[in-house]
Amino acid sequence: MDSEELLYHVKITTHIASDIVAAEVDEDAMMLLEQAIIDSVGEANLRPPVHTPGGEDFHHYAVQRPALKTTMLGLGCGLEPGLHHPHMKFNHTRLITGVEILTRVLLAAIQKAQ
């Protein structure tokens, strides 16, 4: 901001109104999740990771607990018209798929830690 203040001869004051952090994906956690997806729904349903500049409140876990290995699961469930939209709808049977994937990744993480 200093350069803009000098360039335009103005004083710029900022205020951070919220604290949102970006995702920090751990490579080991991502590999465990990928294998859990393959084991649950098959390799044909595994998609490349999506890289997003967005923030999410769950990403604070990695900041507050740096030793925690984190990643994200994008569960294809036909969600529309958008997350948090008042008329959001999705295929509820995919929740069972999500539970299976997360159970497998947790069991694999426990086994790897032993």
Model region roles, listed by residue range:
Residues M1-Q114:
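Metal-dependent amide/peptide-bond hydrolase catalytic core
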